[in-house]
Amino acid sequence: MSQSALHTEFGDIAGLRAALAERRVSAVELAESGLAAAQAAAGLNAFLHIDPELTLVQARAADAALAAGTAGPLAGIPIAHKDAFVTRGWRSTAGSKMLRDYLSPFDATVVERLQAAGAVSLGKLNCDEFAMGSGNENSAFGPARNPWDLAAVPGGSSGGSAAAVAARLVAGATGTDTGGSVRQPAALCGVSGIKPTYGTVSRYGMIAFGSSLDQAGPLAPSSRDLLELLDVMSGFDPRDATSLERCDDAANAPGRIRAAFDAAQNGYQAAGSQPLKGLRIGVPAEFFGAGLTPDVAAAVEAALRQFEALGAERVAISLPRTELAIPAYYVIAPAEASSNLARFDGVRYGHRAAEYSDLNEMISRSRAEGFGDEVKRRILIGAYVLSHGYYDAYYLQAQRLRRLIAQDFQRAFAGQCDVIMGPVAPSVAKNIGENRDDPTADWLADVYTLGVSLAGLPAMSVPCGFGAAGRPVGLQIIGNYFDEGRLLAIADRYQQVTDWHQRTPATQDA
Protein backbone atom coordinates (compact mmCIF):
# COMPACT_ATOMS: atom_id res chain seq x y z
CA MET A 1 0.00 0.00 0.00
CA SER A 2 1.44 3.34 -0.99
CA GLN A 3 1.67 6.02 1.67
CA SER A 4 -0.39 8.42 -0.44
CA ALA A 5 -3.29 5.95 -0.52
CA LEU A 6 -3.53 5.42 3.24
CA HIS A 7 -6.81 7.22 3.94
CA THR A 8 -8.44 5.68 0.85
CA GLU A 9 -7.87 2.17 2.22
CA PHE A 10 -10.78 2.62 4.63
CA GLY A 11 -13.48 3.69 2.17
CA ASP A 12 -15.61 6.74 2.84
CA ILE A 13 -15.56 9.09 5.82
CA ALA A 14 -17.78 6.75 7.85
CA GLY A 15 -15.38 3.87 7.19
CA LEU A 16 -12.42 6.03 8.05
CA ARG A 17 -14.09 7.09 11.31
CA ALA A 18 -14.62 3.44 12.25
CA ALA A 19 -10.98 2.62 11.48
CA LEU A 20 -9.82 5.48 13.68
CA ALA A 21 -12.14 4.47 16.52
CA GLU A 22 -10.89 0.88 16.34
CA ARG A 23 -7.24 2.06 16.30
CA ARG A 24 -6.55 0.43 12.94
CA VAL A 25 -5.00 3.72 11.92
CA SER A 26 -4.13 6.92 13.75
CA ALA A 27 -4.86 10.52 12.89
CA VAL A 28 -1.13 11.22 12.83
CA GLU A 29 -0.55 8.41 10.32
CA LEU A 30 -3.31 9.76 8.11
CA ALA A 31 -1.96 13.30 8.35
CA GLU A 32 1.59 12.25 7.55
CA SER A 33 0.50 10.21 4.55
CA GLY A 34 -1.71 13.05 3.35
CA LEU A 35 1.12 15.55 3.61
CA ALA A 36 3.39 13.18 1.68
CA ALA A 37 0.70 12.72 -0.98
CA ALA A 38 0.23 16.46 -1.33
CA GLN A 39 3.98 16.91 -1.74
CA ALA A 40 4.14 14.13 -4.34
CA ALA A 41 1.27 15.74 -6.25
CA ALA A 42 2.78 19.24 -6.21
CA GLY A 43 2.38 19.36 -9.99
CA LEU A 44 -1.38 19.66 -9.55
CA ASN A 45 -0.85 22.99 -7.77
CA ALA A 46 -3.92 22.15 -5.70
CA PHE A 47 -2.38 23.34 -2.43
CA LEU A 48 -1.21 26.91 -1.89
CA HIS A 49 -0.14 26.68 1.75
CA ILE A 50 0.99 23.66 3.78
CA ASP A 51 2.42 23.74 7.31
CA PRO A 52 3.16 20.19 8.51
CA GLU A 53 3.52 21.20 12.13
CA LEU A 54 0.11 22.90 12.25
CA THR A 55 -1.42 19.80 10.68
CA LEU A 56 0.30 17.42 13.08
CA VAL A 57 -0.77 19.47 16.11
CA GLN A 58 -4.39 18.94 15.02
CA ALA A 59 -3.76 15.24 14.33
CA ARG A 60 -2.23 14.66 17.76
CA ALA A 61 -5.21 16.41 19.36
CA ALA A 62 -7.56 14.14 17.41
CA ASP A 63 -5.69 11.02 18.54
CA ALA A 64 -5.83 12.22 22.14
CA ALA A 65 -9.59 12.82 21.88
CA LEU A 66 -10.08 9.37 20.36
CA ALA A 67 -8.11 7.79 23.19
CA ALA A 68 -10.09 9.72 25.80
CA GLY A 69 -13.47 8.94 24.26
CA THR A 70 -14.23 12.60 23.63
CA ALA A 71 -13.72 12.63 19.88
CA GLY A 72 -15.95 14.65 17.58
CA PRO A 73 -17.69 13.13 14.55
CA LEU A 74 -14.81 13.99 12.21
CA ALA A 75 -11.89 13.28 14.53
CA GLY A 76 -8.78 12.54 12.49
CA ILE A 77 -10.45 12.94 9.07
CA PRO A 78 -7.98 14.63 6.66
CA ILE A 79 -9.49 17.62 4.85
CA ALA A 80 -8.31 20.93 3.42
CA HIS A 81 -9.80 24.39 3.03
CA LYS A 82 -10.32 26.59 0.02
CA ASP A 83 -8.15 29.66 0.44
CA ALA A 84 -11.25 31.83 0.51
CA PHE A 85 -11.69 31.03 4.23
CA VAL A 86 -9.51 32.82 6.75
CA THR A 87 -7.49 30.54 9.00
CA ARG A 88 -5.39 31.28 12.03
CA GLY A 89 -1.81 30.15 11.38
CA TRP A 90 -2.05 29.54 7.64
CA ARG A 91 -1.88 32.40 5.17
CA SER A 92 -5.26 33.44 3.79
CA THR A 93 -4.81 34.86 0.29
CA ALA A 94 -8.04 34.28 -1.68
CA GLY A 95 -5.71 33.38 -4.53
CA SER A 96 -4.62 37.02 -4.82
CA LYS A 97 -1.36 38.93 -4.74
CA MET A 98 -3.31 41.51 -2.74
CA LEU A 99 -3.32 39.13 0.25
CA ARG A 100 -0.13 37.21 -0.51
CA ASP A 101 1.20 37.43 3.05
CA TYR A 102 -2.00 37.98 5.02
CA LEU A 103 -2.29 36.10 8.32
CA SER A 104 -5.74 36.16 9.89
CA PRO A 105 -6.11 36.53 13.67
CA PHE A 106 -9.15 34.21 13.66
CA ASP A 107 -10.69 31.20 11.94
CA ALA A 108 -13.75 31.35 9.71
CA THR A 109 -16.82 29.73 11.28
CA VAL A 110 -16.68 26.88 8.75
CA VAL A 111 -13.05 26.19 9.68
CA GLU A 112 -13.82 26.55 13.38
CA ARG A 113 -16.73 24.07 13.26
CA LEU A 114 -14.87 21.44 11.28
CA GLN A 115 -11.87 21.72 13.58
CA ALA A 116 -14.13 21.47 16.64
CA ALA A 117 -15.51 18.24 15.15
CA GLY A 118 -11.94 16.92 15.03
CA ALA A 119 -11.17 17.25 11.32
CA VAL A 120 -7.48 17.65 10.52
CA SER A 121 -6.58 20.27 7.91
CA LEU A 122 -3.70 19.54 5.55
CA GLY A 123 -3.59 23.14 4.34
CA LYS A 124 -5.13 25.76 2.05
CA LEU A 125 -6.28 25.07 -1.49
CA ASN A 126 -5.89 26.99 -4.73
CA CYS A 127 -8.77 29.04 -6.13
CA ASP A 128 -9.54 31.75 -8.63
CA GLU A 129 -8.63 35.16 -7.29
CA PHE A 130 -11.35 36.28 -4.86
CA ALA A 131 -13.38 33.31 -6.20
CA MET A 132 -13.87 35.03 -9.57
CA GLY A 133 -13.54 32.46 -12.33
CA SER A 134 -14.69 29.15 -13.75
CA GLY A 135 -11.36 27.44 -14.39
CA ASN A 136 -8.95 28.31 -11.55
CA GLU A 137 -6.86 30.14 -14.15
CA ASN A 138 -7.28 33.47 -12.38
CA SER A 139 -5.23 32.50 -9.33
CA ALA A 140 -2.23 34.74 -8.72
CA PHE A 141 -0.30 31.57 -7.87
CA GLY A 142 -0.90 29.74 -11.13
CA PRO A 143 -3.73 27.43 -12.14
CA ALA A 144 -4.56 24.21 -10.38
CA ARG A 145 -4.63 21.27 -12.77
CA ASN A 146 -7.24 18.59 -13.34
CA PRO A 147 -6.01 15.18 -12.08
CA TRP A 148 -7.83 13.46 -14.95
CA ASP A 149 -5.82 15.40 -17.53
CA LEU A 150 -3.10 17.81 -16.47
CA ALA A 151 -3.71 19.89 -19.60
CA ALA A 152 -7.28 20.60 -18.46
CA VAL A 153 -8.70 23.10 -16.01
CA PRO A 154 -10.21 21.66 -12.82
CA GLY A 155 -13.07 24.15 -12.92
CA GLY A 156 -13.48 27.09 -10.63
CA SER A 157 -13.43 28.87 -8.53
CA SER A 158 -12.93 25.98 -6.05
CA GLY A 159 -10.56 24.23 -8.44
CA GLY A 160 -7.92 23.32 -5.89
CA SER A 161 -10.59 21.75 -3.68
CA ALA A 162 -11.95 19.61 -6.52
CA ALA A 163 -8.48 18.61 -7.71
CA ALA A 164 -7.38 17.58 -4.21
CA VAL A 165 -10.49 15.44 -3.71
CA ALA A 166 -10.29 13.89 -7.20
CA ALA A 167 -6.66 12.92 -6.58
CA ARG A 168 -7.72 11.56 -3.18
CA LEU A 169 -5.19 13.77 -1.39
CA VAL A 170 -7.92 14.49 1.19
CA ALA A 171 -11.18 12.86 2.24
CA GLY A 172 -13.06 16.10 1.67
CA ALA A 173 -12.58 19.82 1.16
CA THR A 174 -14.38 23.09 1.68
CA GLY A 175 -15.38 25.34 -1.17
CA THR A 176 -17.47 28.41 -1.87
CA ASP A 177 -20.19 28.76 -4.49
CA THR A 178 -21.27 32.18 -5.75
CA GLY A 179 -22.43 31.23 -9.24
CA GLY A 180 -21.40 27.58 -9.48
CA SER A 181 -17.97 27.49 -7.87
CA VAL A 182 -18.56 24.23 -5.97
CA ARG A 183 -20.74 22.48 -8.52
CA GLN A 184 -18.73 23.24 -11.63
CA PRO A 185 -15.30 22.05 -10.41
CA ALA A 186 -16.95 19.03 -8.81
CA ALA A 187 -18.41 18.13 -12.21
CA LEU A 188 -15.20 18.72 -14.16
CA CYS A 189 -13.12 16.70 -11.69
CA GLY A 190 -15.56 13.82 -11.21
CA VAL A 191 -16.34 14.35 -7.52
CA SER A 192 -19.47 15.26 -5.54
CA GLY A 193 -20.16 18.78 -4.32
CA ILE A 194 -23.09 20.67 -2.84
CA LYS A 195 -24.13 24.31 -2.53
CA PRO A 196 -26.69 24.53 0.29
CA THR A 197 -29.54 27.00 0.56
CA TYR A 198 -28.25 30.55 0.99
CA GLY A 199 -27.89 31.29 4.70
CA THR A 200 -27.55 27.66 5.79
CA VAL A 201 -23.78 27.85 6.32
CA SER A 202 -22.10 30.82 7.97
CA ARG A 203 -20.22 33.30 5.78
CA TYR A 204 -18.28 34.68 8.75
CA GLY A 205 -14.61 34.56 7.84
CA MET A 206 -15.29 33.81 4.18
CA ILE A 207 -13.50 36.41 2.07
CA ALA A 208 -16.44 38.08 0.35
CA PHE A 209 -17.10 38.23 -3.38
CA GLY A 210 -20.87 38.65 -3.82
CA SER A 211 -22.48 38.90 -0.40
CA SER A 212 -26.03 38.02 -1.50
CA LEU A 213 -24.76 35.00 -3.45
CA ASP A 214 -21.74 33.52 -1.63
CA GLN A 215 -22.37 30.24 0.16
CA ALA A 216 -19.96 27.65 1.53
CA GLY A 217 -20.26 23.99 0.63
CA PRO A 218 -18.17 20.81 0.76
CA LEU A 219 -16.63 18.66 -1.97
CA ALA A 220 -15.96 14.95 -1.44
CA PRO A 221 -16.06 11.65 -3.35
CA SER A 222 -19.64 10.71 -2.43
CA SER A 223 -22.97 12.07 -1.29
CA ARG A 224 -22.57 10.37 2.09
CA ASP A 225 -19.21 12.10 2.55
CA LEU A 226 -20.86 15.43 1.76
CA LEU A 227 -23.46 14.70 4.44
CA GLU A 228 -20.74 14.13 7.04
CA LEU A 229 -19.14 17.49 6.26
CA LEU A 230 -22.19 19.66 5.57
CA ASP A 231 -24.01 18.56 8.71
CA VAL A 232 -21.10 19.90 10.77
CA MET A 233 -20.59 23.04 8.68
CA SER A 234 -24.23 24.18 8.76
CA GLY A 235 -26.03 26.04 11.51
CA PHE A 236 -26.98 29.53 12.62
CA ASP A 237 -24.14 31.92 13.40
CA PRO A 238 -24.96 35.25 15.10
CA ARG A 239 -21.71 36.70 13.73
CA ASP A 240 -23.08 36.45 10.17
CA ALA A 241 -25.96 38.81 9.36
CA THR A 242 -27.04 36.56 6.47
CA SER A 243 -27.16 33.38 8.57
CA LEU A 244 -30.61 31.83 9.01
CA GLU A 245 -31.90 30.92 12.47
CA ARG A 246 -34.57 28.61 11.09
CA CYS A 247 -35.03 26.54 7.94
CA ASP A 248 -38.80 26.35 7.50
CA ASP A 249 -40.02 24.44 10.57
CA ALA A 250 -36.60 23.31 11.84
CA ALA A 251 -33.82 25.16 13.61
CA ASN A 252 -30.77 25.78 11.44
CA ALA A 253 -28.41 23.67 13.53
CA PRO A 254 -26.04 20.73 13.12
CA GLY A 255 -28.14 17.59 12.84
CA ARG A 256 -30.93 19.13 10.73
CA ILE A 257 -29.54 17.93 7.41
CA ARG A 258 -28.70 14.47 8.74
CA ALA A 259 -32.23 14.11 10.13
CA ALA A 260 -33.71 15.02 6.74
CA PHE A 261 -31.32 12.61 5.00
CA ASP A 262 -32.26 9.78 7.35
CA ALA A 263 -35.99 10.45 6.96
CA ALA A 264 -35.69 10.36 3.18
CA GLN A 265 -33.57 7.20 3.27
CA ASN A 266 -36.08 5.43 5.50
CA GLY A 267 -38.81 6.16 3.00
CA TYR A 268 -36.71 4.97 0.09
CA GLN A 269 -35.75 1.73 1.85
CA ALA A 270 -39.41 0.96 2.48
CA ALA A 271 -40.16 1.34 -1.23
CA GLY A 272 -38.30 -1.83 -2.20
CA SER A 273 -36.85 -2.38 -5.67
CA GLN A 274 -37.94 1.04 -6.91
CA PRO A 275 -36.88 3.23 -3.98
CA LEU A 276 -37.50 6.52 -5.79
CA LYS A 277 -41.04 5.67 -6.92
CA GLY A 278 -43.17 8.80 -6.73
CA LEU A 279 -40.22 11.18 -7.09
CA ARG A 280 -40.90 13.69 -9.87
CA ILE A 281 -37.77 14.87 -11.67
CA GLY A 282 -38.17 18.12 -13.58
CA VAL A 283 -36.01 18.27 -16.70
CA PRO A 284 -35.82 21.82 -18.11
CA ALA A 285 -35.86 22.04 -21.90
CA GLU A 286 -33.57 25.06 -21.64
CA PHE A 287 -30.79 22.89 -20.16
CA PHE A 288 -30.64 20.74 -23.30
CA GLY A 289 -30.55 23.29 -26.11
CA ALA A 290 -27.82 24.75 -28.27
CA GLY A 291 -24.46 24.93 -26.55
CA LEU A 292 -24.70 21.60 -24.73
CA THR A 293 -22.13 19.22 -26.19
CA PRO A 294 -23.35 15.77 -27.29
CA ASP A 295 -21.01 13.88 -24.93
CA VAL A 296 -22.31 15.72 -21.86
CA ALA A 297 -25.92 15.35 -23.05
CA ALA A 298 -25.44 11.59 -23.45
CA ALA A 299 -23.96 11.14 -19.96
CA VAL A 300 -26.73 13.19 -18.34
CA GLU A 301 -29.41 11.32 -20.30
CA ALA A 302 -27.97 7.99 -19.11
CA ALA A 303 -28.13 9.25 -15.53
CA LEU A 304 -31.75 10.30 -15.95
CA ARG A 305 -32.61 6.85 -17.29
CA GLN A 306 -30.96 5.33 -14.22
CA PHE A 307 -33.18 7.46 -11.99
CA GLU A 308 -36.20 6.26 -13.95
CA ALA A 309 -35.07 2.67 -13.35
CA LEU A 310 -35.07 3.50 -9.63
CA GLY A 311 -38.73 4.46 -9.92
CA ALA A 312 -38.57 8.22 -10.48
CA GLU A 313 -40.81 9.94 -13.01
CA ARG A 314 -39.35 12.34 -15.56
CA VAL A 315 -41.38 15.53 -16.08
CA ALA A 316 -40.69 18.07 -18.82
CA ILE A 317 -40.55 21.59 -17.39
CA SER A 318 -39.48 25.04 -18.51
CA LEU A 319 -37.18 27.54 -16.84
CA PRO A 320 -37.68 30.24 -19.47
CA ARG A 321 -35.17 32.73 -18.09
CA THR A 322 -32.22 30.32 -17.90
CA GLU A 323 -30.04 32.26 -20.35
CA LEU A 324 -31.04 35.61 -18.81
CA ALA A 325 -29.40 34.48 -15.57
CA ILE A 326 -26.04 35.26 -17.18
CA PRO A 327 -26.54 39.03 -17.66
CA ALA A 328 -28.41 39.31 -14.35
CA TYR A 329 -25.59 37.61 -12.47
CA TYR A 330 -22.86 39.58 -14.21
CA VAL A 331 -24.50 42.80 -13.11
CA ILE A 332 -25.32 41.84 -9.51
CA ALA A 333 -22.16 39.91 -8.61
CA PRO A 334 -19.69 42.54 -9.93
CA ALA A 335 -21.71 45.28 -8.22
CA GLU A 336 -21.33 43.50 -4.89
CA ALA A 337 -17.69 42.68 -5.61
CA SER A 338 -16.83 46.31 -6.35
CA SER A 339 -18.21 47.22 -2.94
CA ASN A 340 -16.60 44.34 -1.05
CA LEU A 341 -13.18 44.80 -2.61
CA ALA A 342 -13.09 48.53 -1.90
CA ARG A 343 -11.61 47.60 1.49
CA PHE A 344 -8.37 46.42 -0.13
CA ASP A 345 -6.59 49.73 -0.46
CA GLY A 346 -3.09 49.18 0.91
CA VAL A 347 -3.91 51.13 4.07
CA ARG A 348 -5.42 48.66 6.52
CA TYR A 349 -4.07 45.37 5.20
CA GLY A 350 -3.06 43.71 1.99
CA HIS A 351 -0.56 44.65 -0.67
CA ARG A 352 0.89 48.17 -0.59
CA ALA A 353 2.80 49.68 -3.49
CA ALA A 354 6.47 50.33 -2.78
CA GLU A 355 6.58 53.73 -4.47
CA TYR A 356 3.99 56.52 -4.41
CA SER A 357 3.88 60.29 -3.99
CA ASP A 358 0.63 60.73 -2.07
CA LEU A 359 -2.28 58.80 -0.57
CA ASN A 360 -4.32 58.68 -3.77
CA GLU A 361 -1.40 57.29 -5.76
CA MET A 362 -0.64 54.78 -3.00
CA ILE A 363 -4.20 53.43 -3.14
CA SER A 364 -4.42 53.35 -6.94
CA ARG A 365 -1.01 51.71 -7.36
CA SER A 366 -1.64 49.19 -4.60
CA ARG A 367 -4.90 48.11 -6.21
CA ALA A 368 -3.43 48.08 -9.72
CA GLU A 369 -0.55 45.88 -8.58
CA GLY A 370 -2.52 43.71 -6.17
CA PHE A 371 -5.53 42.74 -8.29
CA GLY A 372 -5.45 40.50 -11.37
CA ASP A 373 -7.13 41.21 -14.69
CA GLU A 374 -10.40 39.36 -14.05
CA VAL A 375 -10.89 41.01 -10.67
CA LYS A 376 -10.21 44.43 -12.17
CA ARG A 377 -12.68 43.68 -14.96
CA ARG A 378 -15.44 42.84 -12.51
CA ILE A 379 -14.70 45.82 -10.26
CA LEU A 380 -15.03 48.11 -13.28
CA ILE A 381 -18.31 46.47 -14.34
CA GLY A 382 -19.63 46.80 -10.80
CA ALA A 383 -18.65 50.44 -10.48
CA TYR A 384 -20.28 51.17 -13.84
CA VAL A 385 -23.65 49.53 -13.13
CA LEU A 386 -23.84 51.23 -9.73
CA SER A 387 -22.96 54.66 -11.07
CA HIS A 388 -25.46 57.52 -11.29
CA GLY A 389 -27.43 57.26 -14.49
CA TYR A 390 -26.97 53.51 -14.91
CA TYR A 391 -28.16 52.16 -11.55
CA ASP A 392 -31.82 52.02 -12.62
CA ALA A 393 -31.09 50.77 -16.12
CA TYR A 394 -28.81 47.92 -15.07
CA TYR A 395 -28.67 47.10 -11.37
CA LEU A 396 -32.35 47.50 -10.53
CA GLN A 397 -33.36 45.69 -13.71
CA ALA A 398 -31.03 42.81 -12.82
CA GLN A 399 -32.58 42.57 -9.36
CA ARG A 400 -36.07 42.45 -10.89
CA LEU A 401 -34.92 39.70 -13.23
CA ARG A 402 -33.47 37.85 -10.26
CA ARG A 403 -36.91 37.75 -8.63
CA LEU A 404 -38.46 36.44 -11.84
CA ILE A 405 -35.85 33.68 -12.08
CA ALA A 406 -36.61 32.63 -8.50
CA GLN A 407 -40.32 32.61 -9.35
CA ASP A 408 -39.66 30.29 -12.32
CA PHE A 409 -38.11 27.75 -9.96
CA GLN A 410 -40.94 28.09 -7.43
CA ARG A 411 -43.53 27.61 -10.16
CA ALA A 412 -41.83 24.34 -11.12
CA PHE A 413 -41.58 23.11 -7.54
CA ALA A 414 -45.14 24.15 -6.66
CA GLY A 415 -46.94 21.67 -8.86
CA GLN A 416 -44.70 20.04 -11.42
CA CYS A 417 -41.70 18.40 -9.77
CA ASP A 418 -39.87 17.60 -6.54
CA VAL A 419 -36.32 18.09 -7.83
CA ILE A 420 -34.78 19.40 -11.04
CA MET A 421 -31.97 17.64 -12.89
CA GLY A 422 -29.71 18.50 -15.79
CA PRO A 423 -26.08 19.14 -16.66
CA VAL A 424 -23.78 21.22 -14.49
CA ALA A 425 -21.69 22.57 -17.36
CA PRO A 426 -22.28 22.57 -21.13
CA SER A 427 -19.02 20.73 -21.85
CA VAL A 428 -16.27 18.76 -20.18
CA ALA A 429 -13.23 20.63 -18.88
CA LYS A 430 -11.49 22.93 -21.34
CA ASN A 431 -7.73 23.02 -21.76
CA ILE A 432 -5.80 25.50 -19.64
CA GLY A 433 -5.46 28.71 -21.64
CA GLU A 434 -8.15 27.78 -24.17
CA ASN A 435 -10.33 30.78 -23.31
CA ARG A 436 -7.51 33.21 -22.57
CA ASP A 437 -8.44 35.54 -25.43
CA ASP A 438 -12.15 35.47 -24.63
CA PRO A 439 -12.75 35.82 -20.88
CA THR A 440 -16.52 35.94 -21.35
CA ALA A 441 -16.44 32.33 -22.62
CA ASP A 442 -15.95 31.24 -19.01
CA TRP A 443 -19.01 33.26 -18.02
CA LEU A 444 -21.14 31.26 -20.46
CA ALA A 445 -19.94 28.00 -18.89
CA ASP A 446 -22.04 28.84 -15.81
CA VAL A 447 -25.34 29.05 -17.70
CA TYR A 448 -26.91 26.08 -15.83
CA THR A 449 -25.69 27.06 -12.36
CA LEU A 450 -26.25 30.82 -12.17
CA GLY A 451 -30.03 30.76 -11.89
CA VAL A 452 -29.82 28.46 -8.87
CA SER A 453 -27.44 30.89 -7.16
CA LEU A 454 -29.58 33.92 -7.95
CA ALA A 455 -32.57 32.10 -6.45
CA GLY A 456 -30.59 30.98 -3.37
CA LEU A 457 -31.59 27.33 -3.86
CA PRO A 458 -29.61 24.23 -2.86
CA ALA A 459 -28.02 22.20 -5.65
CA MET A 460 -25.34 19.58 -6.03
CA SER A 461 -23.18 17.89 -8.63
CA VAL A 462 -22.64 14.14 -8.75
CA PRO A 463 -20.35 12.28 -11.18
CA CYS A 464 -22.35 10.62 -13.96
CA GLY A 465 -19.84 9.51 -16.57
CA PHE A 466 -17.15 10.68 -18.94
CA GLY A 467 -17.15 12.71 -22.12
CA ALA A 468 -14.61 13.82 -24.69
CA ALA A 469 -10.98 12.87 -23.98
CA GLY A 470 -12.10 10.82 -20.99
CA ARG A 471 -12.92 13.91 -18.94
CA PRO A 472 -15.64 13.71 -16.24
CA VAL A 473 -19.26 14.84 -16.53
CA GLY A 474 -21.44 15.94 -13.61
CA LEU A 475 -25.20 15.73 -13.09
CA GLN A 476 -26.80 18.71 -11.34
CA ILE A 477 -29.60 17.99 -8.85
CA ILE A 478 -31.52 21.08 -7.73
CA GLY A 479 -33.90 21.17 -4.78
CA ASN A 480 -36.29 23.59 -3.15
CA TYR A 481 -35.20 25.69 -0.19
CA PHE A 482 -33.72 23.71 2.75
CA ASP A 483 -33.95 20.43 0.82
CA GLU A 484 -30.28 19.50 1.25
CA GLY A 485 -31.00 16.30 3.16
CA ARG A 486 -33.32 14.96 0.49
CA LEU A 487 -30.93 15.94 -2.32
CA LEU A 488 -28.12 14.03 -0.63
CA ALA A 489 -30.37 11.00 -0.10
CA ILE A 490 -31.48 11.00 -3.74
CA ALA A 491 -27.87 11.27 -4.89
CA ASP A 492 -26.92 8.46 -2.52
CA ARG A 493 -29.53 6.18 -4.09
CA TYR A 494 -27.99 6.88 -7.49
CA GLN A 495 -24.49 6.24 -6.16
CA GLN A 496 -25.56 2.92 -4.67
CA VAL A 497 -26.21 1.58 -8.19
CA THR A 498 -23.40 3.36 -10.06
CA ASP A 499 -19.68 3.62 -9.47
CA TRP A 500 -18.78 6.91 -11.16
CA HIS A 501 -18.02 8.50 -7.77
CA GLN A 502 -15.59 5.70 -6.92
CA ARG A 503 -13.47 6.13 -10.02
CA THR A 504 -10.21 8.02 -9.77
CA PRO A 505 -7.55 8.92 -12.33
CA ALA A 506 -5.45 6.06 -10.95
CA THR A 507 -8.19 3.41 -11.21
CA GLN A 508 -9.33 4.64 -14.62
CA ASP A 509 -5.79 4.36 -16.02
CA ALA A 510 -5.46 0.88 -14.52
From Swiss-Prot:
UniProt KW keywords: ATP-binding, Ligase, Nucleotide-binding, Protein biosynthesis
Residues forming the catalytic site: K82, S157, S181
Gene Ontology BP term (one): translation
MF terms in GO: ATP binding; glutaminyl-tRNA synthase (glutamine-hydrolyzing) activity
Enzyme class: ligase
InterPro entries found in the cross-reference section: Amidase, Amidase_CS, Amidase_dom, AS_sf, GatA
This protein's record includes keyword Lipoprotein: no
Gene Ontology CC terms: glutamyl-tRNA(Gln) amidotransferase complex
Entry's EC annotation: 6.3.5.7
Stored Pfam families: Amidase
SUPFAM superfamilies: Amidase signature (AS) enzymes (SSF75304)
Catalytic reaction annotation: L-glutamyl-tRNA(Gln) + L-glutamine + ATP + H2O = L-glutaminyl-tRNA(Gln) + L-glutamate + ADP + phosphate + H(+)
Described function: Allows the formation of correctly charged Gln-tRNA(Gln) through the transamidation of misacylated Glu-tRNA(Gln) in organisms which lack glutaminyl-tRNA synthetase. The reaction takes place in the presence of glutamine and ATP through an activated gamma-phospho-Glu-tRNA(Gln).
Similarity section: Belongs to the amidase family. GatA subfamily.
The protein's assembly and partners: Heterotrimer of A, B and C subunits.
Name assigned to this protein: Glutamyl-tRNA(Gln) amidotransferase subunit A
Lineage: Bacteria, Pseudomonadati, Pseudomonadota, Betaproteobacteria, Burkholderiales
